[in-house]
């Protein structure tokens, strides 16, 4: 992801279908994201007792702020391309389905200087309202303290997003890696993984 983000040429992520977890985290490292109208994006790692990796907890808040980023990560459900466009994480939605053609048009606009190439780690739109971000962190933490007893990853996700808002990118990325490792070792993660595969096996029998 860092290699993509650091590329000196504009990098476009074209999203057709569903980009969840690692696929969306990869798209976040691109400089621009173009999606079809039917596309879905999301970060469902919480359902497995994990947190978004590859810089997902650090890049998304820099674009859309703490509240929207936390809702996506803590809910774990896919959102539509239209919702992504409204939040700012998707740069363009192609209604006709001609994704490559639309992306080429966007690329030409970029080379003409209409859309500056800014690495996601350097984006600051989501960091501007410090007070709102601080309030959002507190509200989400309080909510999960009430309903998330016995769970581990929601609080790690909140802590990672808080780091994204208050520390340099590399420091936040290091914290994310350490938090991911802690989640991997948690009994909650092991239980949720077991439940996930048990549910899939049961569905095959129906």
Question: What residue spans do the PLM features occupy?
Answer:
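Amphipathic alpha-helical segments at domain termini/boundaries
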Residues: 25-29, 71-179, 197-206
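Residue-level "edge-of-site" marker
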Residues: 17, 40, 58, 85, ...
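An acidic, glycine-rich surface segment that forms the CoA-thioester-binding/catalytic face
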Residues: 1-17, 56-58, 63, 189-206
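Active-site-adjacent scaffolding segments
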Residues: 2-9, 37, 47-48, 57-81, ...
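Long, low-complexity segments enriched in small/aliphatic residues
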Residues: 177-183, 188
């Amino acid at each position: 992801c860092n290699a993509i983000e650091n590329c000196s040429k504009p990098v476009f992520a074209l999203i057709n279908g569903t980009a969840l977890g690692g696929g969306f985290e990869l798209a976040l490292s691109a400089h621009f994201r173009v999606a079809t109208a039917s596309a879905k994006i999301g970060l469902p790692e919480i359902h497995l007792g994990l947190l978004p990796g590859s810089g997902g907890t650090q890049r998304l808040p820099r674009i859309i702020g703490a509240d929207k980023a936390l809702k996506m990560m803590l809910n774990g459900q896919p959102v539509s391309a239209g919702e992504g466009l409204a939040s700012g994480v998707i740069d363009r939605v192609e209604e006709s389905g001609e994704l490559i053609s639309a992306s080429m048009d966007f690329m030409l606009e970029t080379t003409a200087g209409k859309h500056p190439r800014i690495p996601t780690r350097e984006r600051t739109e989501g960091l501007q309202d410090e007070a709102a971000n601080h309030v959002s962190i507190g509200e989400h933490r309080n909510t999960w303290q009430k309903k998330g007893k016995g769970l581990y990853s929601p609080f790690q996700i909140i802590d990672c997003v808080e780091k994204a808002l208050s520390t340099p990118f590399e420091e936040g990325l290091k914290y994310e890696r350490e938090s991911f490792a802690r989640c991997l070792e948690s009994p909650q993660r092991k239980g949720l993984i077991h439940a996930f595969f048990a549910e899939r096996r049961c569905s095959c029998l129906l």
